[in-house]
Amino acid sequence: LFVKTLYHVFPQIKAFGCCHEVFGTQKVLRGIYEEETGDKIADWHDIHVNVVGINHFTWFDYASYKGIDLFPIYRKYTEEHKEDGYKEADKNWANSTFECAHIVKFDLFRKYGLIAAAGDRHLVEFMPGVGDSYLKDPETVKRWKFGLTTVDWRKKDLQERLAKSARLAA
């Protein structure tokens, strides 16, 4: 909607929409770097990445911080944390539809050598065959430590969006 509005108001603009989870993956990289090195990154924007793929199925084929290649640090971390994943201090995958432990992301990195840059629940949607090992049944999803968007959440979200639209139109 935002990009569509930009083109409507300013047709000459060169813009594209990108899932915000790319930025979330930069924050995960920051956390892993800090945990592994003990050095603090003041701003996750200082992590430079090259993004490839399509919306909700995006990948980093390059990631660096101050000229330091983050792939070896990420590789080491994914090997050491393939079972428990990465947990951001204030978030827990078990309490939220939209959180995850990034274990699918780690698994895909070990398989393909690129950093998956979307949430685990989006990544598995694009992985028929391979994805079956992630989505086989509720116990499998739980083992991979990511949440699925529930029908109840979708219904509630729709009602909230419709109410907001009505308020804005009034």
Where does each model-flagged region fall?
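Long, compositionally biased stretches enriched for glycine and/or charged residues
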Residues: E34-A170
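Rossmann-fold NAD(P)-binding glycine/threonine-rich loop
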Residues: L1-I13
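Catalytic or ion-translocation cores adjacent to nucleophile or general acid/base/metal-coordination motifs
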Residues: P11-I32
